[in-house]
């Protein structure tokens, strides 16, 4: 294991584990030896201690090992201001950190050095000369490092090395040339908020254990409902572990609204329920139906037009078919920003149909909800205010660190009635404050992570206008890419017309295929192009873009932009890199 006294780590050169008042001990000499750099100090310490006194392998008592690693504070200040260079991580374990006696100084030093690793990673994430990914195949990583869990603890030097190794092979999702997922970017205020949230380490189920966070969730959800267009921000909502769970919440509440007895008696007490969503919608709708006992066969996929938008006439036709069979339509899930095409279903037309047949209307705006922050683009969600529930993921288009997904419900109190179980050890009715702030009983979870603070703090730092500028920039970059490649040799668009969102879908056609007729052989060969280029991107580590087939369309690239760090130059680079990597195919 490399010494922390050299190279990347630069943790300092002194070991404070010795007893300064007893210079005759090996420990005191070790402290002197630690003044040598380049790892020599650690080697000298090993010689001075001998094999029998190595803290990690000695096999001696816990007390003797702790004494060997003891770090004494001499500054008498709170917090401790002793130089971190006095700490030798090779001689320390997690048990030497707080709440250990005299654990303050090594704790501060250790966390500061973890922070240094993180900060270097943050800086590298925005450096275009660094790789987006240092790709290794799974078997290579498994063979190159020992990832197994052991019975005996490792020292803190090794723990810091694990931190470095983990980040070395992690995807730099904040890199300006990472376009692979809907969630990209690395916001500094959001990152700081996430660190604070983890430090507070509390749960969101009652006001008494999360007073500030519960209030911030109340304020933030109300603001989001106002932006949707519900009068005065009325309604309800909750932050959940992602858009898939938010969509399942909507399905759960819609079912309860129509058949409240299902909560106690189960699906056997209700007729067969049918949900409707577009054929381009997110797979989470079917997952939710499976989890809730409704069944995937009870999710009817509605046809889309060539741009990926739900066709209202087909929706109404399928509703009538279901009703004629004696089944009960209970939910229509429209999509505002589909995952692949970035399409926006015609919400006003869908709302009219839902009103006509008295069906719960849900809008999955996990990807497109961020456009509500933009005066220029929010028209694409016209009609969202007529929905009964909305999924909105700020961790996507708004760049909030994962995870941050909200379900907003128009009817106040419905979520509480649907999910509450009155656990008396948490939700006592005789508390000395307003019990409406004990939000945990309306959630499916008991333990619930604090997801709101990242969004709230970013909103305070950026303002609504800052989010608007972020979103407008990303959509402008998508239009820039579209305008470059729509008539460029070697590119074919998957659908005609300017994209509505930042999704730009296209094929790159290598020179060898450009002369072929548009037939089955050409399509078969074209389907193999995107996977090979993507693999080469990852091998070189220069950029990342997703690809997929859809319906009768063979593998194509789906470019999405949600990272405000991206520029026109990064789009130019992407085009050139695709051409470089695909010319010989």
Swiss-Prot record:
It comes from the Eukaryota. Keywords: Cell membrane, Cell projection, Cytoplasm, Cytoplasmic vesicle, Decarboxylase, Golgi apparatus, Lipoprotein, Lyase, Membrane, Neurotransmitter biosynthesis, Palmitate, Phosphoprotein, Pyridoxal phosphate, Synapse. Residues 1-25 are annotated as: Disordered. One of its GO terms (biological process) is cellular response to hypoxia. GO terms for molecular function: glutamate binding; glutamate decarboxylase activity; protein-containing complex binding; pyridoxal phosphate binding. The keyword Signal does not apply. Changing residue 82 to S: No effect on palmitoylation. It is an enzyme of class 4 (lyase). The keyword Cytoplasm applies. It is a lipid-anchor; Peripheral membrane protein. CDD domains: DOPA_deC_like. This is Glutamate decarboxylase 2.
């Amino acid at each position: 294991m490399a010494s922390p006294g050299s190279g990347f780590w630069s943790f300092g050169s002194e070991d404070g584990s010795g007893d300064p008042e007893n210079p005759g001990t090996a420990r005191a000499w070790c402290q002197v030896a630690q003044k040598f750099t380049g790892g020599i100090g650690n080697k000298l310490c090993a010689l001075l201690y001998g094999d029998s006194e190595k803290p990690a392998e000695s096999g001696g008592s816990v007390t003797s090992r702790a004494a060997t690693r003891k770090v004494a504070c001499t500054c008498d200040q709170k917090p401790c201001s002793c130089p971190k260079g006095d700490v030798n991580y090779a001689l320390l374990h997690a048990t030497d950190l707080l709440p250990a006696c005299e654990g303050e100084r090594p704790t501060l030093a250790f966390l500061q050095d973890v922070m240094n690793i993180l900060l270097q990673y943050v800086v590298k994430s925005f450096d275009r000369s660094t790789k987006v990914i240092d790709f290794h195949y799974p078997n290579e990583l498994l063979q190159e490092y020992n990832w197994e869990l052991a019975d005996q603890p490792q020292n803190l030097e090794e723990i810091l090395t694990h931190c470095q190794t983990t980040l070395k092979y992690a995807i730099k999702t904040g890199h300006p040339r990472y376009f692979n997922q809907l969630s990209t970017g690395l916001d500094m205020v959001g990152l700081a908020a996430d660190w604070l949230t983890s430090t507070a380490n509390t749960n969101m189920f009652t006001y008494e254990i999360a007073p500030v966070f519960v209030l911030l969730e109340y304020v933030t959800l109300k603001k989001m409902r106002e932006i949707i267009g519900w009068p005065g921000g009325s309604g309800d909502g909750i932050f959940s572990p992602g858009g898939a769970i938010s969509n399942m919440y909507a399905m759960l509440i819609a079912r309860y609204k129509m058949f409240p007895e299902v909560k106690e008696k189960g699906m056997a007490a209700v007729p067969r329920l049918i949900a409707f969503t577009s054929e381009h919608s997110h797979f989470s709708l079917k997952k939710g139906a499976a989890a809730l006992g409704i069944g995937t066969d009870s999710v009817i996929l509605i046809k889309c037009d060539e741009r990926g938008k739900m066709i209202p006439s087909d929706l109404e036709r399928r509703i009538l078919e279901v009703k004629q069979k004696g089944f009960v339509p209970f939910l229509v899930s429209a999509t505002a920003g589909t995952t692949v095409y970035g399409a926006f279903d015609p919400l006003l037309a869908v709302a009219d149909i839902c009103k006509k047949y008295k069906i719960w209307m849900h809008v999955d705006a996990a990807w497109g909800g961020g456009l509500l922050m933009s005066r220029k683009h929010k028209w694409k969600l016209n009609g969202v205010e007529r929905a009964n529930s909305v999924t909105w993921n700020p961790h996507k288009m708004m760049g909030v660190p994962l995870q941050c997904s909200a379900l907003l419900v128009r009817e106040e109190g419905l979520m509480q009635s649907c999910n509450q179980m009155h656990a008396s050890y948490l939700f006592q009715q005789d508390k000395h404050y307003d019990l409406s702030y004990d939000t945990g009983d309306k959630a499916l979870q008991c333990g619930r992570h604090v997801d709101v603070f990242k969004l709230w703090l970013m909103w305070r730092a950026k303002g609504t206008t800052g989010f608007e500028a972020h979103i407008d920039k990303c959509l402008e970059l998508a239009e820039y890419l579209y305008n470059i490649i729509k008539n460029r040799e070697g590119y074919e668009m998957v659908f005609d017309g300017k994209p509505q969102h930042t999704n730009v879908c296209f094929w790159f056609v290598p020179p060898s295929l450009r002369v072929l007729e548009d037939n089955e052989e050409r399509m078969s060969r074209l389907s193999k192009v995107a996977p090979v280029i993507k693999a080469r991107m990852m091998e070189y580590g220069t950029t990342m873009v997703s690809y997929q087939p859809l319906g009768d369309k063979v593998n194509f690239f789906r470019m999405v932009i949600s990272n405000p760090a991206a520029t026109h130059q990064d789009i130019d680079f992407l085009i050139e890199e695709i051409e470089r990597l695909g010319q010989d195919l």
